[in-house]
């Protein structure tokens, strides 16, 4: 069974819908450059309304390890999801504190230069400023995948962006021999194809279940229903 993570929840009504839909995970984003950013106080309030069977994932970008650990120790999060340049030493600190870790690796979006032998190169857009996910511009997709597979994180995630709703070429990760989360541009309409293509451990959705920047109960329900039917 493919697990489900509904990410970027910010309101009590989002939690209430999640409680009805029963995903395995929900995500709180602790990054002030995200429109879905929440404070520790907000997250604690939301966590208090959440079904205890649903695990909370805290999404961080180059945050001090002590901050991540403190959120875990006070019960705001169960799992840390890392989208910056966090290295193996950083992951070890979280493991030593008892945390389960998901490490995200940035795949080039559909249409960008994927730089694999035998594949035609497409012009790569100008390198963006700021790291939202482990920087991969300048690395081949082969190198990114190799780095991901070797990561000491409990789970890895392949994601082309930072909540932009963009997809990537799923064929590139087909056959990966470890459990991973698939993210990026997933919707109720394409989730069946995504799961059938790469058989991920879990799928992660945020913008694909929103309308006008807020979580849409109908889209949330449709996404979960479509995934559970596979």
Show where each model-derived region lies:
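Conserved N-terminal beta1-alpha1 strand-loop-helix module at the mouth
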Residues: 1-117, 122, 137-158, 163-230
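Cationic, low-complexity basic patches in intrinsically disordered or flexible, solvent-exposed regions
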Residues: 128
């Amino acid at each position: 069974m493919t697990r489900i993570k509904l990410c970027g929840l910010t309101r009590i009504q989002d939690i209430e819908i999640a409680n009805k839909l029963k995903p395995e995970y929900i995500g709180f984003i602790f990054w002030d450059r995200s429109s879905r950013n929440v404070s520790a106080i907000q997250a604690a309030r939301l966590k208090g309304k959440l079904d205890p069977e649903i695990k909370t994932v805290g999404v961080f970008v180059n945050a001090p390890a002590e901050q991540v650990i403190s959120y875990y120790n006070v019960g705001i999060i169960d799992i840390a999801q890392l989208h910056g340049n966090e290295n193996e030493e950083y992951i070890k600190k979280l493991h030593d504190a008892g945390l389960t870790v998901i490490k995200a690796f940035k795949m080039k979006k559909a249409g960008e230069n994927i730089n694999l032998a035998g594949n035609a190169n497409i012009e790569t857009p100008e390198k963006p400023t700021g790291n939202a996910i482990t920087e991969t511009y300048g690395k081949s997709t082969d190198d990114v995948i190799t780095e991901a597979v070797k990561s000491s994180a409990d789970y890895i995630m392949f994601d082309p962006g930072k909540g932009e709703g963009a997809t990537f070429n799923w064929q590139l990760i087909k056959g990966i021999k470890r459990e991973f989360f698939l993210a990026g541009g997933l919707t109720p309409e394409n989730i069946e194809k995504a799961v059938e293509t790469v058989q991920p451990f879990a799928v992660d959705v945020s913008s694909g279940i929103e309308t006008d920047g807020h979580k849409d109960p109908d889209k949330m329900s449709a996404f979960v229903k479509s995934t559970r039917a596979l």
